Amino acid sequence: MKFLTSIWTSIALIVLFLGIRVLDPSFIEQTRLNTFDQYIKSLPDKESDVVLLNLGEETLANYGQYPFPRHTYAQLISDLRNANAGMIVFTIMFPEADRFGGDEVFISWVNNNGIILSQDASSRGRSDSAPYVGTATLGEGDAYDFVPEYKGLVTNLPELETAAWGVGLINSKKEVDNITRRIPLLSQINGQLYPALPLEVIRVLQDKKSYSLKADYDGIKDVMIPPYDPIKTEYDSSIWLNTNYTHKEYEYGYDALPNLNGQTVIVGLTASGLASQIPTPQGLFSAQELQASALQTVIDGTSISRPQWTGLAEIGLILIGALLIVSSIYYLSVWIGAAVFFAVVSAYSILVWYFWTSSGILLDLSYSIIVYIISFASSAFNNFYIQFKLRQQIKGQFSTYLSPDLVNQLVKNPELMVLGGERKEMTFMFMDIIGFTPISEAYKEQDDPEGLVELINYYLDTMTK
């Protein structure tokens, strides 16, 4: 039992929790992601420059059964051009020929008309290649070692992709809880790098022929499209999304389109039962709403990142903070340990908030605080248990030999017990108790010498007060 209440037990507990953090099971990762969600939700709400054109229930009522004939999409492009739209982006894909024979008209409206189409990287994709834009790699790393790899593509009709100004992927990064928080800016299929849809939109807007990226041995650092600042990414080219945007939305065939003043328009399906809803920390998003948030995140230069060093830094800070808490309790006192605990928690929280507000770097607050609390609670419990057992031991050893007042003094302050005794000025009182012999003999006959000691202590206490 003595070992279980020693400092080594608390240290072993810290090592156990550090081991769990290194293994990083799914429930720990989920807790961390939920914490990051709260950080991102703290960002101020902003109005996006991207306009959404939805194909919803009213659109179906006006244009009939979905999928629409391609000449309907040609008319949609015409209406957007009359509304002075800028870049027109489709999150709808057109992999098959139109059963109504409207492909030729649609292609003519897509051709050289500021249209960007979508692709989907998938293991079930029937294509293993598509038109792509070259990528220049800077640095000593190989991007192909880090970006997500897929076996196939869901593409559009080749004539459409040739006519469009750009084509981008609409994939997101798979999370442990299936909530979309990140998208990879680059993916590889059949040995080629393909851009995400937001990246392709920016390239076309800037009239650039290619991208450039920087990669080191530990992953991709950033993706660049001048004149924008480098887009900071995670090691696999993923970026965190700011979903705190509000977008102007119109339903095609129902809402009158205003003068769009050259704004980028993303077209997508929202009709119930046809459109898939994407779970995000802010709720369910449509495909075009998610892509609009991703595009606006990049345009605004919102830097949300979790560099690879953050995990190691968190483990180191957990170790240092927990050891400070445990040591202060065992070697000083519980009250000093409580002060150290609050100081460590406050300092770590300030550090996390500083990195987030100044650089957009995500440091996990939740797991560290949990370990600090458990370290403090276990050490404080051990300390109280040790003190409790010591008081019990003092009472058991001295209650039959010393007066209750003196025993209570020793219980409150065990340091009063000094080996070898101590020097004090003392006053002695000699007395003779009348009838003491028969009293002591009575206790002897009752086999209760302790009772006699208790009686004498009571008598002497009363006489000396």
Report residues per predicted region.
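Transmembrane alpha-helical segments that form the functional core of multipass membrane systems
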Residues: 304, 308-382
